[in-house]
Regions:
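Short helix-loop-beta connector
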Residues: 134-138
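AMP-binding/adenylate-forming catalytic core of the ANL superfamily
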Residues: 189, 298, 303-414, 433
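Conserved AMP-binding/adenylate-forming
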Residues: 222, 227-324
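Adenylate-forming
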Residues: 196-216, 235-238
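Conserved helix-loop-beta element of the AMP-binding
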Residues: 139, 206-228
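Conserved S/T- and glycine-rich ATP-binding loop of Class I adenylate-forming
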Residues: 35, 101-104, 140, 189, ...
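Nucleotide 5′-phosphate-binding alpha/beta core
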Residues: 1-100, 106-123, 130-131, 381-388, ...
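AMP-binding/adenylate-forming
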Residues: 115-128, 139-198
């Protein structure tokens, strides 16, 4: 690739829209035929729907292809052959890598990749990192456990592909990671938004280190949670580290489907060379291209071979921006990041509530700590929302005013009232991977 441009692949990333749509349709047809011909699972659901690969001739025809739900993926892996069931499109002997989902929404889903898939996966991530300014001069620290979750495996290989020097910090604890980043003058790292904030907090409280002044970090890539596209959370992270923070959203089932570029346009580019993203209206169930109208993301990985991902219902809620980006890429932009999961965006007291709205308010108050927890319960016939927060040390005397302001902002942002508990600083749960701060306990009889 040309390291003197701002694009990893200038030809693809600036391709005229009509040509890009033609490329996606061609790839979708190829992926559908591959799955139909080689995966008993996909062939079964397509035959049940009366669908033949040759039926797909236009982008609109794609909407007739049955969606795949996560529960379907869980069910198929209970079948023979172990451990994936009959979903694979390659012989088991061609599988080189096992991954699984984190299990935060239920039984983990197993995922298989071939060596060809892993090369593709690193290429999709190279688009992400290069757009965020990673170059061969960077020393990149990756502070994740290198375990069975996909997390930053692809990012590691992509950083190497770009030419970066990669420091794998998996076995180190948080304090050791910070010290190693300082020692090696690392210029970039990757983590969940929760862990980005947690590392800065640990550095200050346990090591007496101001990471914005004593480390050399210039850019941070976030994944796993919506936080890096929530303006107040992004500002906290950038303020704590004195670095640019970029969002990325992916999934084990699909791959690295989106990224924020260096322009930080307030949304994410869909990695359209490799993925087809559709948005399904939450109310009508129809596919919509209407900017500003949120819906569930239906995603197809256009080049995945071992375990195809065709029209997977991610349950992630996004919306199109409808605006171009100043970076010059023709890949479409979302408006903001992932707004939440369709499973989490729920009616409380008759009002639709997105957990990201609560995070945006909490993180906007400088007197509050980074951590919080939301519990939705039933008290008799009425819904009740309990929000647990932490005051920063030294702010105890300002508690009354802070909480009054917090309640006002929450009501303005969400049109709901909250019970608020203040907990000692450092007492709420801390997370390294995906944080589960929003808990709807109403269905559990709480």
């Amino acid at each position: 690739m040309n390291f003197h441009t701002k694009y990893w692949n200038p030809f693809i990333e600036t391709m005229p829209l009509e040509e890009l749509r033609e490329l996606q349709l061609k790839k979708f047809k190829r992926a559908l035929l591959w799955a139909y011909s080689n995966s008993p699972f996909y062939r079964r659901i397509y035959k049940e729907a009366g669908l033949e690969p040759g039926d797909i001739k236009t982008h609109k025809d794609i909407r007739c292809v049955p969606k795949v739900e996560k529960d379907m993926l869980r069910e198929v892996q209970t079948r023979e052959p172990f451990p994936y069931g009959d979903i694979l499109s390659v012989p088991l002997k061609e599988v080189t890598t096992f991954r699984q989902t984190s299990g935060t929404t239920g039984t983990p889903v197993y995922h298989a990749d071939s060596w060809q898939d892993m090369e593709w996966y690193s290429e999709t991530w190279a688009y992400v990192l290069y757009a965020q300014g990673y170059r061969e001069t960077d020393r990149v620290f990756i502070p994740f456990g290198y375990n069975i979750f996909v997390a930053f495996w692809g990012a590691h290989f992509a950083a190497e592909k770009i030419g970066c020097e990669v420091v794998p910090g998996g076995v180190l604890d948080t304090q050791a990671r910070i010290l190693k980043m300082k020692e090696l003058h690392c210029t970039a790292f990757m983590a969940t938004p929760t862990y980005v904030l947690g590392m800065a907090d640990t550095a200050a409280r346990k090591l007496g280190i101001d990471v914005s002044k004593e480390l050399s970090i210039q850019r941070i890539t976030c994944a796993g949670e919506p936080g890096a596209c929530i303006p107040t959370t992004k500002r906290r992270m950038e303020g704590a580290w004195g670095a640019k923070v970029y969002d990325h959203i992916g999934a084990t089932e699909s791959g690295a489907w989106s990224y924020e570029c260096m322009e930080q346009p307030g949304g994410l580019h869909v990695n359209e060379a490799f993925f087809l993203v559709e948005i399904e209206d939450l109310e009508t169930g129809e596919i919509t291209d209407d900017p500003k109208k949120p819906g569930k993301m239906i995603i197809t990985a256009l080049d995945r071979s071992a375990k195809p991902c065709i029209r997977f219902d991610s349950k992630d809620v996004i919306r199109w921006s409808g605006q171009p980006c100043n970076c010059g890429r023709t890949f479409r932009l979302t408006d903001g990041g992932v707004m939440g999961r369709a499973d989490d965006i729920t009616k409380v007291k008759g009002v639709l509530l997105a957990p990201t709205a609560i995070e945006e308010v909490v993180r906007s108050l400088s007197d509050l700590g980074n951590e919080y927890e939301v519990l939705v319960t039933k008290k008799g016939d009425l819904d009740d929302i309990l929000l647990k927060v932490e005051l920063l040390p030294g702010k105890e005397g300002e508690e009354k005013g802070v909480l009054a302001h917090l309640k006002d902002q929450l009501r303005l942002r969400t049109n709901l009232g909250y019970q608020i508990e203040v907990h000692p600083y450092g007492s709420l749960p801390r997370y390294e991977l995906k944080a589960k701060r929003f808990k709807d306990l109403r269905m559990k009889g709480a």
